Amino acid sequence: MMWFRRDLRLGDHPALAAAVRTGEVAPIYIRDHSLATSERRSSYLAASLQALDESLGGNLHVFEGNPVEILKKLSAQYGEIFATEEFTPRAILRDKKLAKAQLTINHVGSPYAVTPGRVRKSDGTPYRVYTPFYKVWCAVGWRAPSELPALPKWISPPPDARKFPKITCEIPASGELVALDRWRDFYKTDLARYDEERNRADLNTTSGLARHLRWGEIHPRTILAELNQTEAHDVFRKEIAWREFYADVLFHEPHTNLDYYKPEFSRMRYNEAGKAFEAWCHGKTGYPFVDAGMRQLNAEGWMHNRLRMVVASFLIKDLHIEWQHGARYFMEKLFDADVASNAHGWQWTAGTGTDASPYYRVFNPIEQGRRFDPEGSYIKKYVPELAHLAASEVHEPWLYLDGLSHGYPERIVDHATERHEALARLAELKPRS
């Protein structure tokens, strides 16, 4: 029996290859309702499962309920259980419950090129800083993509094992074939300029692979195997390593999905998440680059990575709201929402995490817009109330007579004032001499 989890593909799948070597395989997926999810992630999962089912010739068994109870019944019927190992706090807790119930899972492979916990210092402790982690991560290396030993014979599901979730909202294209096509297209068209253009919000030059990696529709090994030593390829390799670094950090510090990596920041003065938070959520802060990012997130379930940092900095250091509020909102809205990358991406910007940008680094939302959306085309796409303004005006519409004439809101705070306030609150944490 092959238990699919965050690995919804057939290619480069060590656990599936191991299961196939034992003979006939029952491919299964269990919908565990004890795990909270958003409408967007649930709908994306539904589409990805449908794509996987097509690849399996309509033989995917989909169950609904408690994994322990379901697997007890299935193991008596089908025998050995194979699965890709998972490393999030909830997945580890689930697998401990399975072990307590004396259910043996044959874990083969992981969602990462290098399994969390393998990259360590010479004294055996985990890395807290990305750059030395990256060097050892590269030195540890990864296997070549695996192949299925032969076309397996799938065990057909009974009628009561087809409990697919429903698609209840608009979703982007999903599935293994889509992921592979996207990777090939990015490799041919945009990867060569990735080091120069990846931060430009107005250029559609990012990989678009985040959601496919999150759901295991493509394995990072498949991508890494095709990268060379050019500057652009090296920068992209480092971005994949950031994902693996954050997974490693969360593996060693599982409380940091919701709590501070640096506990002293829990003592900082924060504001309640009231009307200002609502304005941030809806893209109505009065800062065009911030609002464009939030409106893209709300409309599409995705946001450019540069914008993720800018809007996070604005929430934490301009509005003085704790990072967890923003992280939860991202988890609700993003199709690519990943516990480790989301929590530690937020903590990096907040200055509270491992290898973090220091708290005193405050992104200027106006200058960020000018630098990474110089003509204002990204802003105008998502904030049409500013489409009438020239490129020189769109980043500070409040300075111009007709800047707010089409319904765009006034600024809810003054950035310069709130930057000083953020630094003052940071100073309060320092011990007095």
Language-model segment annotations:
Residues 124-265, 372-433:
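Glycine/tryptophan-enriched, flexible segments
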Residues 44, 48, 90, 175, ...:
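Soluble or luminal CAZymes and related metallo-dependent hydrolases
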Residues 17, 291, 416-420:
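A broad detector of short, well-ordered amphipathic alpha-helices
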Residues 1-145, 232, 341, 424-429, ...:
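Trp/Phe/Arg-rich N-terminal binding region typifying the photolyase-homology
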Residues 41, 45, 282, 286, ...:
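Residue-level preference for long, well-ordered alpha-helices that form the structural scaffold
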Residues 5-7, 30, 65, 86-87, ...:
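An acidic- and aromatic-residue-enriched active-site/binding cleft used to recognize and process polar
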Residues 205-385:
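Active-site-proximal binding-pocket segments
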